[in-house]
Swiss-Prot record:
Protein name: E3 ubiquitin-protein ligase SPL1
Knockout consequences: No visible phenotype under normal growth conditions, but mutant plants show increased disease symptoms and cell death after inoculation with an avirulent strain of Pseudomonas syringae pv. tomato DC3000.
The protein's role, per its UniProt record: Possesses E3 ubiquitin-protein ligase activity.
Native source species: Arabidopsis thaliana (Mouse-ear cress)
Localization per Swiss-Prot or TrEMBL: Plastid, Chloroplast outer membrane
Encoding gene (name): SPL1
Length: 338
């Protein structure tokens, strides 16, 4: 599971890195056009070599704008929706308002951008637009009055039509837009902007400078996210290896501690085999005050948790539990004798 999560993070980091590079290439490929009057000459020079991706700003205009049915707003894209609102009686015999969305209708006309110095046609369908349309009109049309018999039948059925709400959303004439796309010539020789087969394409209300800055910030965020995911993936993948190395180091240290303790016991046994001359004895004078581990040095430490005093300082540092009661050792106190 750790390996799978690690590989997933690494793949996510690689994907974000590729997205970062793609966004960076998109930013570098965009040619900013500050005045539309210069676009004709720019297309003449550069579009012959590679597809020319430009970024332009201007106000929306059209020779044949669409007029909203319920208002005087003119636009180039129109989306009209109708919502029938009714009252229904539920099982508690209370009336609840419900609505049913009818089939929406869309319209669009040829449009262009105009910045005061020139204009350029934009060949973008409403499906490719990706803009939040402005509400041109929002009208509620009440249902026609019904006869007394029809009203009584509707009451008995638990159904009453309130009316229809008509909402029209448009891209109004004069709306400032920023368009990033490919500049080409149409069959009439006029310059138009269209969606490129490969490359960036944006239609937004954001000004040109803010759009470029936003794309740069987005690229940097993707870069940092890719680095973070990659590092996390490497850590998750290498975690079993790190745990294995630490376990081997711990086993090696434990084995050396045991060998050291065994060597001390063997050395102590060899010394005890020699004649014992006077030396340290217990308080009763019967048994030497020797460490119970090495049986060589006198015990001079006490374990705070259990209170036993039975080991010398070197042996107490090698132990994890008390050799008498097997309680875990947390703190060792050294005892000084007079």
């Amino acid at each position: 599971m750790i390996h799978l999560a690690g590989f997933t993070c690494c793949l996510g980091g690689v994907a974000l890195y590729l997205l970062t590079r793609s966004t960076g290439r998109d930013i570098k490929s965009i040619t900013r056009v500050y005045q539309l009057k210069d676009l004709e000459q720019l297309v003449e020079v550069e579009s012959k070599v590679v597809p020319l991706i430009i970024a332009v700003s201007g106000d929306v205009g059209s020779e044949t704008p669409i007029k909203c049915e319920h208002s005087y707003v003119l636009g180039v894209f129109l989306k009209r929706t109708a919502e029938q609102q009714v009252l229904r009686r539920n099982w508690r015999f209370s009336w609840v308002r419900n609505s049913t969305l009818m089939q929406p209708m869309t319209k669009e006309v040829p449009w262009y951008l105009d910045d005061g110095t020139g204009r350029v046609n934009v060949d973008v369908s409403q499906g490719e637009l990706g803009l939040a349309l402005t509400v041109g009109s929002d009208v509620f049309e009440k249902a026609e009055p019904v006869s007394l018999v029809q009203g009584a039948l509707g009451y008995l059925k638990g159904f009453k039509i309130l009316g229809v709400r008509h909402v029209e959303r448009v891209v109004p004439i004069g709306t400032p837009l920023t368009v990033v796309g490919e500049a080409v010539r149409d069959g009439m020789g006029n310059v138009r902007i269209q969606k490129p087969e490969q490359g960036p394409f944006y239609v937004t209300y954001i000004p040109l400078d803010q759009l470029i800055s936003k794309l740069g910030d987005l690229s940097r965020r993707f870069k940092y996210a890719s680095m973070g995911l990659t590092v996390l993936g490497v850590i998750l993948i290498s975690k079993p290896v790190i745990e294995y190395i630490l376990k081997r180091i711990e086993d090696t240290l434990e084995r050396r501690r045991r060998q050291f303790a065994l060597k001390r016991v063997v050395d102590a046994a060899a010394r005890r085999a020699k004649p014992v001359t006077g030396g340290g004895t217990s308080r009763d004078g019967d048994t030497p005050d020797l460490c119970v581990v090495c049986l060589d040095q006198k015990y001079n430490t006490a374990f705070v948790e259990c209170g036993h005093m039975c080991c010398c300082t070197p042996c107490s540092l090698q132990l994890r539990t008390c050799p008498l009661c097997r309680e875990r050792i947390q703190q060792v106190l050294k005892i000084y004798r007079h």
